[in-house]
Amino acid sequence: MNMISKEGAFIMAKVFITLTGTKHYFGNDFLEKGTRIRLEKEPDNEYDKEAIQVKMKGLGKIGYVANSPFTVKGESMSAGRSYDKIGDKAKGRVIFVVDGGVVCRIINTGKEQNLVIEKEQNSD
């Protein structure tokens, strides 16, 4: 899944996740394409050991990475599939806001060897 660029940096293939559960926090009306998010693993979650919180600067937790076939949208990875692909913390960006979820792209996995290099700011 990873490739090495001419400069020797690792480039990760595009990985999408679905942000879900926003109605339990602030809703998703304020989210739009390009909004930056942070992902944080929550290994002590009593319901899901692969839970990944989604946070925003200034608001804190706004939801979770979807981990059910009923909440994962399109080509997104579930929290279970993406859990080992990110460090304890990662960064993402909103791509689409759709009914029942928000599709986001992981732009930095939080792992040194998996730094995502974006050639274009708005290539999505």
Walk through the language-model features, giving the residues of each.
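Conserved active-site motif detector
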Residues: M1-D124
